Amino acid sequence: MTLSRRVLVGTGAGLAAGVATVAVLALTAPLGKLERSSPVVLDRHGVWLRALLVEDGRWRLRADLDRTDPIFIRRLIALEDSHFWIHPGVDPAALARAAASDLKAGRVRSGGSTLTMQLARRLEPQPRTLPAKAIEAARAVGLEARLGKRGVLAAYLTLAPYGGSLEGVRAASLAYFGHEPSTLTNAEQALLIAIPQAPELRRPDRHPLAAKRARAAVLHRLVLKGLISAKAAREAAAEPIPRRMVFPERAWAAAGELARAASPTQPTVVSTIEAPLQARLEALAAQTGAGQGEQSSVAIVVVDTATRAVRAIVSSAGRDRPGGWVDATRALRSPGSSLKPFIYAFAFEQGLAAPETKLADAPVAYAGYEPENFDRTFHGEVTAAQALQNSLNVPAVAMLAKVGPEAFQARLESTGARLVRPKAAANDPGLALALGGEGVTLRDLAMLYAALGDHGLARPLTWTQLQLRSDRAEGSRLVSAEAADQVLSILRESPPPPGRAPPALSAGAPKLAFKTGTSYGFRDAVAAGVGDGWTVVVWTGRPDGGVRPGMTGREAALPLLFQVFDVLEANAPQAQTLTPQVAPPALAQLDSRGGPQMLFPPDGASVMVDSYGPQSRGLALAARGDRLRWYVDGQPLAEADGQVVWRPEYPGFYRIAAVDDHGRHATARVRIK
């Protein structure tokens, strides 16, 4: 074999080995980063509650092509990779031009990278060298084979760098514009195309002038390609550069738990929480905490009694306050007297007493344990109902002695609730349970009270819409329906807080069954209530367990409980106050040649609906005009049986439009309550 032939063979073998090595690298392009995206928790209607960073400290939100502005996608491809839909991952012509430029310069300085090659680089960054470029090209071909075009595009839009900790078009759109990228303005699209080319140098929050120049350059290129008019480009270029917004963190503690439990394959969790209700109660908690002193905190749990869906959960009065990062809904705190209703319920069920049974409120001792009432007085003979309504301690301890403290605790814990005794004294037979001698979480207390509200049937709380839709167990019987209903009937006649009318004088108002609790040393103030389909438990106290002299459940927690029910009542769907389903005949005869005219709902209206979503009766929209098409916030509505019925998904403001065949339209901005 001649020398030249040996050289050729050696060169060919080396080239083959190189190609094989590159091929292996392409086939093993790591997808781990793509599989790790930020878990996002939404409210029941899809409103953002909270997201978490991925392990490497990035906001990485998985992109959805079907929910990304298609015009933005077309413009991105036109400017960044015009042959995207036809090349195999590498654009040979662009790569050849870039290679020639790079060889001439002796280093990588020119582009030529397709979106797929950029994706390969994002998945595993390589040094900017010619061999690294070859690896990226080979991996791009492999990625195309593995993911397909739509998969590659979705992956690129998930990992594209947008400065700082932001990755992907969703994170950037939410951080800079405050909304999902489903609909983007010309200015927003241009900025999202410009930033990834130099993400740190073009960060709008740190380098607004550079971001503005880069956006203008993209707009100019769009004009040259005929993808936008010069006038529209000038208008977009004149818009201010946005600043970075803080991501929402509603229901921060509970949403954080749900996010951490999310599956890597399903990083989005739709919770049962109502975002508008959550926001109102967080504000109420902050106001209440401020009114009770700098060291005080507040917690609230709101449960839909029928489904056990947690509709709102407030963990503190604010994380900017002392101890504000402590989730008080999970902390073991003394329930005070708030477990007394269950003592009486078990006693009624077992025939040990009835609501009108006479009980002695007098001094008594149990192996050295001598309970006394909160007011340090005894009231003689009282009925069981009176003892419960006035939270008398001595009769409650007597009832617990008959029921048996161990049996009482076992019955409560059979629901999944956990009662923890801090330190049992030698002379304490467990009767202190009646007065809050064992700790319980606010979440478990809500579960127990929801069982009372559901005729004695216990079920765990529900946190996600997926759980709500799935088949659920029948639940467990905590107490008989008759006993549970008797206890609630008694509690409905309890003395209301100052400033509230007694139940007998509030005909027509929802009847609220409630009980308060105050722990030893005024450390915890608790109030729990059941009424109008809701179970609510509130707590106020110091996160560090400190004493708050005079802050009882009745004084510190009960007013808050009633305020929460006020919010729930104000939030409740009412009968529709505007109900014309079709245009009156006289109006229907009017000439419509002047364009559509909105008839129902009128502009500026506030409309009460019976419920939200598919179960709602809906609103029949009406307008004067011919061959109308209807839109709500830009989304088309379908016509059925000659009518267009709109079923709002959640309360808030909406823009309704009716458009005729000539493009003329009538609009109404309405508020749904």
Predicted regions and their residues:
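Short, well-structured active-site flanking segments
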Residues: 85-94, 167-170, 230-232, 325, ...
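Conserved catalytic neighborhood of penicillin-recognizing serine enzymes
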Residues: 104-128, 245-260, 353-408, 454, ...
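Soluble, non-transmembrane domains of envelope/secretory-pathway proteins that act on or interact
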Residues: 1-11, 19-23, 28, 228, ...
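Active-site loop and adjoining helix of the penicillin-binding protein/serine DD-peptidase-beta-lactamase fold
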Residues: 196-214, 265-277, 320-361, 365, ...
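Juxtamembrane regions of bacterial inner-membrane/periplasmic proteins
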Residues: 1-294, 305-311, 316, 362, ...
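Mid-domain, small-residue-enriched loop/turn segments at the edges of structured enzyme/sensor domains
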Residues: 370-373, 404-449, 456-457, 462
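Active-site SXXK
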Residues: 76-77, 81, 222, 281, ...
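A penicillin-recognizing enzyme superfamily signal
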Residues: 271-292, 300-302, 313, 320-328, ...
